[in-house]
């Protein structure tokens, strides 16, 4: 604890230093906090290089039109949710309201005088003519199913329109486009829940909008872009805490602003609008994108963080073709999450490389109603980088906005104070990053010491001399671990159990591999005190390389985390001599392949007189199903633990008494079953007859490749141990597998259901294959529904 405590004290001192530096920089630059920036102009929140900034919208479109939404003020004494008063932003020499009205009314003819004798008022509505224009009022409850239809020439004369108590009126689209002289609009206590973006586009004379007590959840600022509005009433609507509504809190009276509330997305709770934080608003922004290649499954993982409001839609283009929308199994979107009320989306796109050698262009796109963002990258489909490929944020091109939402130039987006603040924030981020990196280094060093202590307790003891009478042969093959430990969310908290050397007695050699030999032996006090247990002892040559020793350590640590009824029990390790040992459960009937052959239709030609009792006959279908169910159960467990076996076959399964079958490979099968392995293009010996196309081509092993191997193992069991593709050479087998050919159905004992499981394991696309969980369930159903056959011919 001395080291971590000293580091914490050092970190506190550095944090104080960072704060003092930041204070001096801020005071020297004369900066004010972001909250004190001028708010006279409409603003939206944007994200640039991961730093949230408030951008003042000064685009040319907004300067040249007086129909700006302006800065929003709450009249003193009125609740903010009740009335929002807006004032237009005009040039200094203009009178607010007059000049803008002249501009917006240019080219618009208002027919203020209407001949009522030729005008038919809409049913259930009242129409009155005044000196200023027509007033239309529809207040009889639930009499309108749609917006009242008024002739175009009459609509131009309407200055006031009232709709109240119309619960069936749910949307507002383009029904108001001819009401060009409308000044006061009231839609109150209706069922209105949706307003289209162009609903108010032509209402350039509109002064007040009353939308009280409707069902609106969002009211975008874009609805008022073409208006010179003075009052907006939104009381009684269930406005959500979203970026779309964030502009409503941009008011000048802080006391009234604090009273405005919004509902969360679930509608259960409410919060003050001033407390709601919506970091990213506006056009989609690809804030971060990382491309990672995973050798274990031969796939690229494209991880992204994208912001935008409304929530952007994600797609991936490959050579200008949409691959996510098309539903292609070679491209899948996983881990898709949304944060900040749906305004930040994260996810991973899985890319399975194609059999191509030319460069392929990919484009990640994010689209919403405000615009689109693209990021392009290139891949050679046969490229297999050794480490992650990071695409830095600085390489991401500018956003591409839509035509309806123009972007200002960088000089127009940022005020002088913001330009000063950004470098300051950058300096702060650099300092914090430095402190964080130092903390990670110290933490990694602490973990390394802890691991070394564990290894020292396990492997670095001083030992007595131990000599075994049987010499070990030279290293013949480079042996790969038959189980592959993938990255897991948890780390084993205990070291493998240590077995004392004096409790082990080696009896005879039962196998040999590249690492050394496997002995039949006994071990005292292993399972119970004062009792001997028969065990299998896997030894490591004393003169082996450091890499084999590291593999031995990793395998021991991995095996210590596995515990299943159909996996050979790992008891522990012994490192008290030059010959390191692993102690396993002993399975008296040997490997499953030999057992199947000795209990199959050709057993009479294979067995020796003394090797087996004469009364043991051929295995029945029920016994074969019992065998495959046990293998499936073990593989289902490994898949759930994220372990990849990589060499599943009957030769690597062991048989005990009462037909108990367990997974257990001591690495000796490559010497015993030499014809099952083939050296491909100078690589290590590979079991190509059990491997799927992606493993042969890309040398990648995944849980899906284990599923393929299980299908071949299933075929082995129901053919009583025959070698897959026994009629072809290894090179011919590779061509058959690449061309999507599969093994023929085994005769007699294999049911239709079992063969369908085999076919489900041999799908060319890994994502289309059955999972081990599905396989286990299908086989259990096959057993429960399998009729019992009686041999009446014999």
Swiss-Prot record:
Q: Which residues lie on this side of the membrane: Extracellular?
A: 34-419
Q: What does the UniProt entry say about where the protein is found?
A: Membrane
Looking up PROSITE patterns in the UniProt record yields: LRR, PROTEIN_KINASE_ATP, PROTEIN_KINASE_DOM, PROTEIN_KINASE_TYR, RECEPTOR_TYR_KIN_II
Leader sequence range is: 1-33
Q: Which residues carry this modification: Phosphotyrosine?
A: 673, 677-678, 789
Give the region (Disordered) as residue ranges: 36-102
What residue stretches are annotated with the Protein kinase domain? 504-775
One Pfam annotation, family name? LRR_8
Q: Which residues are glycosylated?
A: 64, 102, 128, 288, 374
Please state the Enzyme Commission number of this protein.
2.7.10.1
Tissue and organ distribution: Expression is confined to the central nervous system and its associated endocrine tissues.
The record places domain LRRCT at: 237-280
List all membrane-crossing ranges.
420-440
The superkingdom listed in its UniProt entry is Eukaryota
Query: What's any one GO cellular component for it?
Result: plasma membrane
Which residues are catalytic? Answer: 647
Molecular-function annotations in GO: ATP binding; neurotrophin binding; neurotrophin receptor activity; transmembrane receptor protein tyrosine kinase activity
Reaction(s) catalysed by this chain, per the record, are: L-tyrosyl-[protein] + ATP = O-phospho-L-tyrosyl-[protein] + ADP + H(+)
The protein's UniProt keywords, in alphabetical order, are: ATP-binding, Developmental protein, Differentiation, Glycoprotein, Kinase, Leucine-rich repeat, Membrane, Neurogenesis, Nucleotide-binding, Phosphoprotein, Receptor, Repeat, Signal, Transferase, Transmembrane, Transmembrane helix, Tyrosine-protein kinase
Positions annotated to bind ATP? 510-518, 538
What is the purpose of this protein? May bind an endogenous invertebrate neurotrophin. Binds human NT-3, but not NGF or BDNF.
Q: What is this protein called?
A: Putative neurotrophin receptor LTRK 1
Query: What is the species listed in this Swiss-Prot or TrEMBL entry?
Result: Lymnaea stagnalis (Great pond snail)
Q: What is the lineage of its organism?
A: Eukaryota, Metazoa, Spiralia, Lophotrochozoa, Mollusca
């Amino acid at each position: 604890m001395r080291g971590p405590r000293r580091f914490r004290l050092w970190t506190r001192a550095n944090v104080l230093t960072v704060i003092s530096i930041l204070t001096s920089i801020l005071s020297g630059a004369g900066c004010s906090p972001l909250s004190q920036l001028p708010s006279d102009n409409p603003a939206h929140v944007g994200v640039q290089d991961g730093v949230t900034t408030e951008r003042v919208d000064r685009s040319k479109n907004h300067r040249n039109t007086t129909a700006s939404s302006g800065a929003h003020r709450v009249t003193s004494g009125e609740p903010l949710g009740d009335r929002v008063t807006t004032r237009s932003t005009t040039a200094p020499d203009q009178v607010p309201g007059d000049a803008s009205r002249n501009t917006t009314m240019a080219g618009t003819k208002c027919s203020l005088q209407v001949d009522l004798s030729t005008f038919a008022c809409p049913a259930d509505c009242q129409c009155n003519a005044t000196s200023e224009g027509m007033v239309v009022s529809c207040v009889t409850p639930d009499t309108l199913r749609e917006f009242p239809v008024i002739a175009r020439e009459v609509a131009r004369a309407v200055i006031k329109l009232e709709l109240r108590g119309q619960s069936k009126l749910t949307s507002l689209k383009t029904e108001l486009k001819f009401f060009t002289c409308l000044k006061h609009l009231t839609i109150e206590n209706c069922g209105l829940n949706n307003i289209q973006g162009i609903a108010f586009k032509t209402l350039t004379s509109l002064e007040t909008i009353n939308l009280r007590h409707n069902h609106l959840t969002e009211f975008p600022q874009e609805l008022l872009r073409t208006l010179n509005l003075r009052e907006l009433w939104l009381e009684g609507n269930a406005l959500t805490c979203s970026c779309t509504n964030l502009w409503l809190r941009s008011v000048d009276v802080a006391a009234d602003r604090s009273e405005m509330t919004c509902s969360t997305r679930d509608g259960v709770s409410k919060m003050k609008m001033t407390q709601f934080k919506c970091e990213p608003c506006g056009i989609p922004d690809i804030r971060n994108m990382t491309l990672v290649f995973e050798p274990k499954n031969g796939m690229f993982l494209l991880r992204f963080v994208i912001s935008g409001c409304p929530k952007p839609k994600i797609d991936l283009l490959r050579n200008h073709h949409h691959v996510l929308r098309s539903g292609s199994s070679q491209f899948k979107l996983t881990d898709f999450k949304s944060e900040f009320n749906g305004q930040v989306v994260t996810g991973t796109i899985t890319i399975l490389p194609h059999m191509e050698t030319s460069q392929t262009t990919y484009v990640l796109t994010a689209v919403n109603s405000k615009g689109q963002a693209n990021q392009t990258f290139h891949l050679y489909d046969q490229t297999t980088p050794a480490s992650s490929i990071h695409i830095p944020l600085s390489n991401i091109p500018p956003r591409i906005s839509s035509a309806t939402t123009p972007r200002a130039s960088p000089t127009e987006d940022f005020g002088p104070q913001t330009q000063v603040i950004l470098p300051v924030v950058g300096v702060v981020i650099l300092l914090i990053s430095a402190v964080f990196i130092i903390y990670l280094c110290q933490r990694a060093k602490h973990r390394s010491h802890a691991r070394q202590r564990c290894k020292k307790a396990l492997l670095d003891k001083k030992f007595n001399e131990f000599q075994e009478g049987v010499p070990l042969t030279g290293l013949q093959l480079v042996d790969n671990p038959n189980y592959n430990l993938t990255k897991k969310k948890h780390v084993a908290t205990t070291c493998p159990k240590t077995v004392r050397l004096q409790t082990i007695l080696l009896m005879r050699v039962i196998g040999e591999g590249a690492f050394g030999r496997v002995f039949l032996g006994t071990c005292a006090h292993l399972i119970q005190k004062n009792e001997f247990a028969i065990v299998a002892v896997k030894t490591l040559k004393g003169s082996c390389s450091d890499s084999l020793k590291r593999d031995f350590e990793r395998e021991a640590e991995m095996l210590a985390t596995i515990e299943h009824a159909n996996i050979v029990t790992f008891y522990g390790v012994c490192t008290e001599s030059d010959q390191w040992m692993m102690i396993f459960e002993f399975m008296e009937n040997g490997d499953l392949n030999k057992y199947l052959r000795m209990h199959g239709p050709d057993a009479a030609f294979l067995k020796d007189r003394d090797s087996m009792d004469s009364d043991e006959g051929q295995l029945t279908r029920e016994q074969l199903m019992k065998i495959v169910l046990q293998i499936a159960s073990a593989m289902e467990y490994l898949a759930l633990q994220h372990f990849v076996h990589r060499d599943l076959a009957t030769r690597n399964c062991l048989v005990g008494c009462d037909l108990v079958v367990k997974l257990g490979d001591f690495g000796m099968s490559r010497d015993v079953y030499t014809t099952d392995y083939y050296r491909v293009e100078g690589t290590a010996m590979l079991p190509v007859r059990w491997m799927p196309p992606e493993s042969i081509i890309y040398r990648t092993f995944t849980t899906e490749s284990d599923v393929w191997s299980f299908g071949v193992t299933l075929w082995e069991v129901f053919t009583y141990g025959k070698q897959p593709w026994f009629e072809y050479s290894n090179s011919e087998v590779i061509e058959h597998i690449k061309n999507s050919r599969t093994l023929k159905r085994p005769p007699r004992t294999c049911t239709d259901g079992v063969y369908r499981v085999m076919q489900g394991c041999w799908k060319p696309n890994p994502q289309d294959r059955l999972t081990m969980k599905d396989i286990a369930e299908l086989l259990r159903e096959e057993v429960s529904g399998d009729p019992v056959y009686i041999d009446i011919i014999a």
